[in-house]
Amino acid sequence: PDNINRSSDGNYWLAMTGMRTPAYDLAMRMPGFRTRMVKRVPPDEWLYSNINNGSVIKFTAEGEVLASYWDKSAENHPAITSMREHRGYLYLGGLMNNRIGRIPLPDADPTWDSSDSYWGPKA
């Protein structure tokens, strides 16, 4: 997980990031290979997924997942490291990305737009 932000409805957004390898992708398409791997290779040498599919999860304070958005192709928004809800949209960014993503959130508060919305008014 990387970066947690508040949503306009009082819940939270979480960015997930990592990198995926061609060897892992190949192993996931070969069940026999995976079976042999877990029988013959020590666990600390197994292939693990480090998925670079951009993903953002919305969840409650209790940890219940309410929504998830991700880029299955890992082409548009790989390795998302940040997100911020602003005026009815969820903006996505990543350290290695050359673009900013924007997802419309139909149920979001369209007035949620400043530090006062996010943190509350200054005392």
Features from the language model and the residues they span:
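Sequence-structural signature of mature extracellular/luminal beta-sheet repeat domains
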Residues: 1-123
